[in-house]
């Protein structure tokens, strides 16, 4: 019997089973122990293959692919710390709902906890963060192939959102020519190999029931809060809220067009809060809210009912309101709960939103970080998409910009870390093949710098704007100790990104005014390549501008 040959047949069943559940993208890192899985993926024509030398970046690449494709994405890594590097992407997927299938090669049981090289306790190492964990046995013909395929089918059928960790131990030898070992074992699956359906088909009902008293609540004074959702859902939510006559507070990731822009500014005005207190019901569609003032209002509002609708399970309401948690796709829920045409009941909030917008527009000419956030709408590629980083940049765009309704916007706003942002953006571009604008801070870019390797070959223009404010200026908005702020919070690195771009053979610009930025963008959108644009801005101007605008709007 050839161990290596049977390992490959075992792996081939696993990979083929994945195709029956919509897996098309497979992300592969180099490794020896993962050879059976890698070869099985490479030989399966159903897959689009992606490779990267860094497992942490690979996990985030898969995350970006899953965000756009809305299908599960598989990741193959070798044993040891390679597996641990998937943790950040796994955690993010668990919070934002993308489906990741993590295929982690492992040493066989007899090599664990005995000093063997590259052998760690992988089974269950991700604790409660995966939606499901499956620890497979060592490949053996004593276990029928139908057990293996039905086990994979069951796990995937139960995967509503988040990650599935499949730990796959393989004994040596890992290399060798294929022979007939295990062929009969494999052939017992019969015509399943020529079919396109899962071996085991399970149905799981997730659709939310219609709220029978909706006809009553839609006649009340309501507020719509829009969190993370798809572009199509964003347009539908905007129309739904407009028909109801309810004010819509749209997050930067809502893609609703934010009809009441600058919400994070005007929510700091007591007049707005007083008017919102008249709401009898708040309907929140989508989770992962960004704005600080929005979260503060959400935490203190006390409507008669607070409904949260999202396709992800769990409470998703850090303020723990009395109300209803409805698990459903937003578009499906809207169809079940149609709006009734009513006059808008809010008068003060539209006025404050317009005045806040005017205050922001008045400062747009200064070349700075806050002004870039406001102007970002003007720089979006036609028929393209936007990827927004974390920390200060996403807060500035949320507070100061008004993105077009239905324009695709992506971000990692689950755990909201700055790790893996460039890798995620690369996945977003690969899955869509659209022109992509990504905007991150300098520390975020440094954190994931080797992801520039993923951006060397793109299928459409990709522009990476690095806002270099020399450190983590988000901490300038927080009451961090002044004497300790620079060394222990901001951590300025005093670097530029021209050499990084050159190392990966990427185009590079460092504009010093809006005209130079617009010229660089115009050239970048004509070229199917990656362009790094570094905006060197005053360290604290972005945070200070936001604070000044908050103070101005609060006194309107």
From Swiss-Prot:
<comment type="pathway">
    <text>Quinol/quinone metabolism; 1,4-dihydroxy-2-naphthoate biosynthesis; 1,4-dihydroxy-2-naphthoate from chorismate: step 2/7.</text>
</comment>
<dbReference type="InterPro" id="IPR029061">
    <property type="entry name" value="THDP-binding"/>
</dbReference>
<protein>
    <recommendedName>
        <fullName>2-succinyl-5-enolpyruvyl-6-hydroxy-3-cyclohexene-1-carboxylate synthase</fullName>
        <ecNumber>2.2.1.9</ecNumber>
    </recommendedName>
</protein>
<dbReference type="GO" id="GO:0000287">
    <property type="term" value="F:magnesium ion binding"/>
</dbReference>
<comment type="subunit">
    <text>Homodimer.</text>
</comment>
<dbReference type="Pfam" id="PF02776">
    <property type="entry name" value="TPP_enzyme_N"/>
</dbReference>
<dbReference type="Pfam" id="PF16582">
    <property type="entry name" value="TPP_enzyme_M_2"/>
</dbReference>
<dbReference type="GO" id="GO:0030976">
    <property type="term" value="F:thiamine pyrophosphate binding"/>
</dbReference>
<dbReference type="Pfam" id="PF02775">
    <property type="entry name" value="TPP_enzyme_C"/>
</dbReference>
<comment type="similarity">
    <text>Belongs to the TPP enzyme family. MenD subfamily.</text>
</comment>
<dbReference type="GO" id="GO:0070204">
    <property type="term" value="F:2-succinyl-5-enolpyruvyl-6-hydroxy-3-cyclohexene-1-carboxylic-acid synthase activity"/>
</dbReference>
<dbReference type="GO" id="GO:0009234">
    <property type="term" value="P:menaquinone biosynthetic process"/>
</dbReference>
<dbReference type="InterPro" id="IPR004433">
    <property type="entry name" value="MenaQ_synth_MenD"/>
</dbReference>
<keyword id="KW-0474">Menaquinone biosynthesis</keyword>
<comment type="function">
    <text>Catalyzes the thiamine diphosphate-dependent decarboxylation of 2-oxoglutarate and the subsequent addition of the resulting succinic semialdehyde-thiamine pyrophosphate anion to isochorismate to yield 2-succinyl-5-enolpyruvyl-6-hydroxy-3-cyclohexene-1-carboxylate (SEPHCHC).</text>
</comment>
<keyword id="KW-0460">Magnesium</keyword>
<comment type="pathway">
    <text>Quinol/quinone metabolism; menaquinone biosynthesis.</text>
</comment>
<keyword id="KW-0786">Thiamine pyrophosphate</keyword>
<dbReference type="GO" id="GO:0030145">
    <property type="term" value="F:manganese ion binding"/>
</dbReference>
<dbReference type="InterPro" id="IPR032264">
    <property type="entry name" value="MenD_middle"/>
</dbReference>
<dbReference type="InterPro" id="IPR011766">
    <property type="entry name" value="TPP_enzyme_TPP-bd"/>
</dbReference>
<keyword id="KW-0479">Metal-binding</keyword>
<keyword id="KW-0464">Manganese</keyword>
<keyword id="KW-0808">Transferase</keyword>
<dbReference type="InterPro" id="IPR012001">
    <property type="entry name" value="Thiamin_PyroP_enz_TPP-bd_dom"/>
</dbReference>
């Amino acid at each position: 019997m050839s161990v290596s040959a049977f390992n490959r047949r075992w792996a081939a069943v696993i990979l083929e089973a994945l195709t029956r559940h919509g897996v098309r993208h497979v992300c592969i890192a180099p490794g020896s122990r993962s050879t059976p899985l890698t070869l099985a993926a490479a030989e399966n024509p159903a897959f689009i293959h992606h490779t990267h030398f860094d497992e942490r970046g690979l996990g985030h690449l898969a995350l970006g692919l899953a965000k756009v494709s809305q299908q599960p994405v598989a990741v193959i890594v070798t044993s040891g710390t390679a597996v641990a590097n998937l943790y950040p992407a796994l955690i993010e997927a668990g919070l934002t709902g993308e489906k990741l299938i993590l295929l982690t090669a492992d040493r066989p049981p007899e090599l664990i906890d005995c000093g063997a090289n590259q052998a760690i306790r992988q089974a269950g190492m991700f604790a409660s963060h995966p939606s499901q964990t499956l620890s497979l046995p060592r490949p053996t013909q004593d276990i029928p192939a139908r057990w293996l395929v039905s086990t994979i089918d069951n796990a995937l059928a139960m995967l509503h959102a988040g990650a599935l960790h499949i730990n796959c131990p393989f004994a040596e030898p890992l290399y060798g020519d294929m022979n007939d070992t295990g062929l009969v074992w494999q052939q017992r699956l019969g015509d399943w190999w020529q079919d396109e359906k899962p071996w085991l088909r399970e149905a799981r009902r997730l659709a939310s029931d219609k709220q029978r008293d909706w006809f009553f609540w839609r006649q009340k004074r309501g507020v719509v809060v829009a969190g993370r959702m798809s572009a199509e859902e964003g347009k539908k939510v905007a129309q739904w809220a407009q028909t109801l006559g309810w004010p819509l507070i749209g997050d930067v990731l809502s893609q609703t067009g934010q009809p009441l822009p600058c919400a994070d500014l005007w929510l700091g005005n007591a007049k707005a809060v007083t008017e919102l207190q008249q709401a009898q019901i708040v309907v929140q569609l989508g989770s992962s809210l960004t704005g600080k003032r929005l979260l503060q209002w959400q935490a203190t509002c006390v409507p008669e009912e607070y409904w949260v609708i999202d396709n992800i399970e769990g409470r998703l309401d850090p303020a723990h309101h009395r109300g209803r948690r409805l698990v459903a796709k937003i578009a499906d829920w809207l169809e079940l709960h149609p709006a009734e045409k009513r006059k808008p009941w809010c008068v003060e909030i539209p006025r404050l939103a317009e005045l806040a917008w005017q205050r922001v527009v008045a400062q747009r000419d200064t070349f700075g970080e806050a002004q870039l956030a406001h102007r970002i709408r003007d720089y979006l590629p036609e028929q393209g998409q936007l990827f927004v980083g974390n920390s200060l940049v996403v807060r500035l765009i949320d507070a100061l910009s008004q993105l077009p309704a239905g324009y695709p916007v992506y971000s990692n706003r689950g755990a909201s870390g700055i790790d893996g942002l460039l890798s995620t953006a690369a996945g977003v571009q690969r899955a869509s093949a659209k022109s992509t604008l990504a905007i991150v801070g300098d520390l975020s870019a440094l954190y994931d710098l080797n992801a520039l390797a993923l951006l060397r070959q793109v299928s459409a223009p990709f522009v990476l704007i690095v806002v270099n404010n020399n450190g983590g200026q988000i901490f300038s908005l927080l009451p961090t100790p002044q004497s300790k702020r620079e060394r222990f919070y901001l951590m300025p690195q005093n670097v530029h990104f021209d050499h990084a771009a050159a190392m990966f053979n990427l185009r590079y610009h460092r504009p010093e005014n809006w005209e130079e930025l617009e010229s660089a963008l115009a050239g970048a959108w004509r070229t199917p390549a990656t362009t790094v644009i570094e905006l060197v801005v005053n360290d604290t101007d972005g945070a200070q501008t936001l604070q000044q605008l908050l103070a101005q709007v609060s006194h309107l």
